[in-house]
Amino acid sequence: MKMKRSPYCFCCSFALLLLVSFLKDRHFCSADPTDGFTEVPLTEDNFVIQKPYDKPLNDRYSYKNGIRRLWVYENDKPFKVGSPTRPRTEIRIKGHDYSSGVWQFEGQVHVPEGTSGVTVMQVFGAVNKATALQLRVYNGDLKSYKSNSVATDIYNKWLRVNVIHKVGKGEITVFINGQQKLVVNDDGPAEHYFKCGVYAAPDGSSNYMESRWKNIKLYKSDNKLEGCNNNHGTWLVQ
């Protein structure tokens, strides 16, 4: 006996076709912040170390087995004579400064217990201040500057950090271990670059500060991507 297809089935089929057509026109990511980006090759020449001016490099920095270890003391000198800035041992990514486009920093960071009151990652360049973003550690918690919480209980763990800067939109998004944790404005257009390591905060710094970094990478997107919505796994297109 020949069975008739119900109008309900036709409606379902039509709805499915519409859904497939809609999805084909969207960019997707697998909840990974690097999807849709192209890796920018880096060499050791791109890793410039800023350290207390009176200390030899190996007194504040080591690179062994793929791990970059950076440390500084609260009473160390600044990175150059006459600078009013706080003590630091930082990696400055050189050769890829930018003032437009969509750029991304990626790295894995380990902060030993006891390190506090220190910036471990920065997006340099802003209108009204020196930086568009600072990720600081206070008593085992990772914060944006001193307020917005990014991650808690981070001591003695490796964290994957991804920072996406959409210059045209003036927006910075921070991911920890692949999960979106923070979206902030970048305080206006400027010449930008990425930094990581240890840079003593204006106050509340521990006597000894250390961070370790590995798998540092830089990415750029040629598309006008506005970000990855991790709740749905899709790229939001400008």
From Swiss-Prot:
InterPro entries: Alginate_lyase_2, ConA-like_dom_sf
Pro-peptide positions on chain: 225-238
Superkingdom field: Eukaryota
Presence of the UniProt keyword Cytoplasm in the record: no
GO cellular component: a single term: vacuole
Record key words, sorted: Signal, Vacuole
Location of the protein in the cell: Vacuole
Cited Pfam families: Alginate_lyase2
Signal peptide coordinates: 1-31
Primary location recorded for the protein, binned into one broad class: other
Stated role: May be a subunit of a vacuolar malate and citrate transporter.
Protein name from the UniProt record: Citrate-binding protein
Organism: Hevea brasiliensis
